[in-house]
């Protein structure tokens, strides 16, 4: 039964009609897995947001806009009008829905993009793609919208980031030719390198907010995957400082999970 949604049988050929309903023992887990695959636009419930949190989240958006302006490169400037439009799009589509980490979705997206800005400030397309990727992944915003409203370079980045399901796939053969050409590769907007920046920024942000997750196995998996795969990728292709940040965040996340598990076990015993 664990492999199916359930079983339903009606007994109508009896004096008292009865209904037999059989559900898998892990029905709640199955339901949660099904719901997480749905675009959040399909999930109508929004979590309560205090006036302070709402004000803080709007401040995050404004600070990100100012942050981007400071990092804009003369040779290939970031279009602040495009950034403003993307921030508005985030608010419209995400509303006050939350990520599994407990963060408001649009606050999380901006936090990830902020890391991308710090790492690849002279590549505007990668920054735009880091904002659009989460929209396409988690909402009903179609890829065709990205293709029609942004240039094909941005579309290609979003498409390639969406194509990564497992972090093992980040170690793409095309990255082998980079060697010590990181700065040149960023300027040339090498697609797989851009994908790596976005995915590792996403991972670093989520690990840093591990305390907000309620499903601890998910955090443990992220942390272990980071230590075995992501840290090596960052050290090999990007910057040792990024690798160090990922390792530190992963180890801290594992400690958070361990402490939470101990508290939960203690509560059960009491």
Name every feature range the model reports, one short phrase each:
Residues 2, 6-270:
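Active-site helical microenvironments for divalent-metal-assisted chemistry
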């Amino acid at each position: 039964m664990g492999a199916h949604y359930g079983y339903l049988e009606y007994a109508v050929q009896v004096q008292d009609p009865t209904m037999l309903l059989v559900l898998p023992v892990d029905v709640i887990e199955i339901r949660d897995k099904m719901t997480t695959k749905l675009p959040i636009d399909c999930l109508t419930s929004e979590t309560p947001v205090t006036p302070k949190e709402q004000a803080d989240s709007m401040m995050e958006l404004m600070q990100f806009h100012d942050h981007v302006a400071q990092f804009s490169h003369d040779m290939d400037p970031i279009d602040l009008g495009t950034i403003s439009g993307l921030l508005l799009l985030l608010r419209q589509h995400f509303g006050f829905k939350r990520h599994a980490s407990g963060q408001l979705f649009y606050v999380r997206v901006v936090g990830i993009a902020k890391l991308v800005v710090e790492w690849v400030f002279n590549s505007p397309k990668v920054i735009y793609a880091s904002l659009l990727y989460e929209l396409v992944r988690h909402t009903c915003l179609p890829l065709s919208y990205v293709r029609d409203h942004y240039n094909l370079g941005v579309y290609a980045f979003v498409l390639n980031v969406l194509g990564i399901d497992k972090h093992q796939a980040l170690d793409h053969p095309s990255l082998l030719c980079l060697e010590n050409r990181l700065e040149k590769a960023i300027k040339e907007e090498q697609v797989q390198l851009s994908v790596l920046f976005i995915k590792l920024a996403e991972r670093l942000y989520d690990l840093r907010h591990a305390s907000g997750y309620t499903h601890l196995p998910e955090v443990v998996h992220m942390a272990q995957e980071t230590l075995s795969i992501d840290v090596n990728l960052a050290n090999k292709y990007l910057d040792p400082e990024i690798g160090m940040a990922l390792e530190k965040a992963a180890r801290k996340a594992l400690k958070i999970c361990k402490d939470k598990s101990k508290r939960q076990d203690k509560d059960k015993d009491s």
